[in-house]
């Protein structure tokens, strides 16, 4: 060994007390044994809107503690005609609400969307929850006996505060019966389909078949001590209103803000959906592919099957077609002599006033080339130059034909319209499918009457993505960075006498062009506050809401 290194050790001061970094004193832990346990639930239809509810009762004299809940859901075989697929992460999107209760009341609960948000950075959990090409790609049935989807089982990890530090954070039963209750979303929320699919029959026959699994711990001579948990509370603002308020805030560890689109029962039909592939490019490619069959037509005469308002022109020999102030170049090879190439110049258009700006989807294409196949009677497109974006793909079909549009907005063929898809994904955020468009330009949070935080940029969203390693478009103020379990979480604390017991959020929505149909997508502000509770085991399992620093 090098002399310099040897001398640096020999010359060290031996009188200083030093900690051993080459070994630790092993401690003998509490004697326990874990086991995977599964049980079936009792199904009812007692939800607020006759939703299905599953209740699982856990009471075993040998189970001292539990955590890591996993819900198994069976998806049936799907047969029939039409286009059909499950929304990505279908297992999570089946869930409306989860609660864990004892005889003393609810211990912990969470909305389905917040559960999904908490697990969005766990790729394994997302995969097992129903993210696969077999489930999510749009499949087609051509006859009533065609199998569109094979039966499958998905597994939903229900992330709870009892999982944070395994045995330390586990929920101790304290000889109590624990009930886990899962409220499910309507079946319409978890499927994507076209109008030819017999959804009414599918909905009647669909039955949620859940099973709950968890890790149960048998512990010898357990010494139970009180602990703290965070419980999320969600408030949804009024439609298109920029404010939302969470009341009775006494000790909060974080506050999250995001927006959701509100489509209603008539605005959930869209032109396309990519299925399993979920990148922004996949949404755009699926949309462009659907439009091209109506946009460029090879026919032996003026195309038929379109509304009278459709403006379809024959492409001249030079291939250049002018649409208002834009030119589109079209070149299709191998066209038979008795046929011509036509371009649809007002496929989808929107405007709020005549003789003013018109949002015309046809104008977003600048060059289209391809080859016509006489055998298949279809055009194989080789190169498409366009400016279609994720917002275009996210426009509900109903907005093209809404009363706000002074033009005949949807001029596609009847055949194309029949392929439109009903999408009722309950966890969409923002105003586009990927939540790329940041529609909040300013955020202000007040605690009582005092301004707690304000921003003109998305810094709270950036920090949320960095800290959680997830990209879900949520803006979060975090008041607690204390290591969990071993310390009481840090909170923003109320002062009721000064009116500081509510968090009020106000946003300024980004300016958008009123001639763009996406401007008219209704939205709701969502605020989620994590309240701090103390878990006690004196007489069964119970929780107490923390009311201040001294609790």
From Swiss-Prot:
Record's bilayer topology term: Peripheral membrane protein
Subcellular location: Membrane
Cited Gene3D superfamilies: Adenovirus Type 2 Hexon, domain 4
Gene Ontology CC annotation, any one: membrane
Keyword tags: Membrane
Induction, as annotated: Expressed in the early phase of the viral replicative cycle.
Statement: the UniProt record of this protein carries the keyword Ligase: no
UniProt function note: Acts with RNA polymerase to initiate transcription from late gene promoters.
Family the entry assigns: Belongs to the orthopoxvirus protein OPG125 family.
Subunit structure: Interacts with the late transcription elongation factor VLTF-4/OPG110. Interacts with the late transcription factors VLTF-1.
Protein name (record): Scaffold protein OPG125
Gene source species: Monkeypox virus
Gene: OPG125
């Amino acid at each position: 060994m090098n002399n310099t290194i040897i001398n640096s050790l020999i010359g060290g001061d031996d009188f200083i007390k030093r900690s051993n970094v080459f070994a630790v004193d092993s401690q003998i832990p509490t004697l326990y044994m874990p086991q995977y346990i599964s049980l079936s639930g009792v199904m009812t239809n007692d939800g607020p809107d006759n939703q299905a509810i599953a209740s699982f009762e856990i009471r075993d004299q040998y189970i001292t503690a539990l955590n890591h809940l996993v819900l198994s859901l069976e998806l049936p075989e799907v047969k029939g005609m039409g286009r059909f697929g499950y929304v990505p992460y279908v297992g999570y999107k089946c869930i409306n609400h989860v609660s864990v209760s004892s005889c003393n009341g609810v211990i912990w609960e969470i909305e389905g969307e917040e559960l999904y948000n908490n697990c969005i950075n766990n790729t394994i959990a997302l995969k097992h929850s129903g993210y696969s090409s077999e489930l999510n790609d749009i499949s087609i049935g051509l006859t009533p006996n065609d199998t569109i989807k094979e039966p499958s089982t998905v597994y939903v990890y229900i992330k709870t505060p009892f999982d944070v530090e395994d045995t330390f954070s586990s929920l101790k039963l304290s000889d109590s019966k624990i009930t886990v209750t899962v409220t499910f979303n309507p079946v319409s929320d978890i499927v994507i389909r076209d109008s030819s699919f017999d959804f009414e029959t599918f909905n009647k026959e669909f039955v949620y078949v859940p099973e709950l699994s968890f890790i149960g711990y048998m512990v010898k001579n357990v010494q139970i001590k009180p602990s703290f948990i965070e419980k999320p509370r969600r408030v949804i603002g009024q439609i298109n209103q920029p404010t939302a308020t969470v009341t009775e805030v006494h000790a909060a560890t974080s506050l999250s803000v995001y927006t959701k689109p509100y489509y209603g029962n008539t605005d959930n039909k869209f032109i396309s959906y990519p299925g399993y592939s979920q990148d922004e490019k996949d949404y755009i490619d699926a949309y462009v592919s659907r439009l091209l069959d109506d946009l460029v037509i090879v026919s032996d005469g003026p195309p038929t099957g379109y509304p009278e308002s459709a403006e379809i022109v024959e492409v001249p020999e030079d291939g250049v077609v002018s649409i208002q102030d834009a030119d589109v170049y079209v070149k299709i090879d191998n066209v038979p002599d008795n046929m011509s190439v036509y371009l649809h110049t007002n496929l989808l258009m929107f405007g709020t006033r005549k003789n003013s700006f018109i949002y015309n989807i046809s104008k977003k294409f600048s060059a289209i080339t391809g080859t016509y196949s006489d055998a298949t009677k279809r055009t194989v497109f080789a190169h498409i130059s366009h400016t279609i974006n994720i917002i275009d793909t996210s426009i509900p079909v109903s907005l093209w034909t809404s009363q706000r549009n002074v033009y005949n907005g949807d001029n596609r063929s009847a055949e194309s319209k029949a392929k439109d898809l009903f999408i009722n994904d309950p966890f969409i955020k923002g105003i586009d499918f990927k939540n790329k468009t940041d529609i909040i330009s300013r955020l202000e949070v007040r605690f009582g009457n005092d301004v707690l935080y304000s921003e003109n940029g998305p810094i709270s969203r950036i920090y949320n993505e960095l800290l959680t390693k997830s990209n879900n478009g949520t803006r979060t103020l975090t008041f607690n960075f204390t290591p969990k379990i071993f310390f009481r979480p840090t909170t923003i604390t109320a002062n009721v006498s000064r009116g500081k017991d509510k968090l009020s959020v106000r946003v300024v929505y980004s300016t958008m062009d009123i001639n763009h149909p996406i401007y008219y997508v209704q939205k709701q502000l969502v605020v989620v506050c994590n309240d701090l509770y103390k878990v006690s085991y004196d007489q069964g399992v119970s929780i107490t809401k923390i009311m201040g620093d001294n609790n």
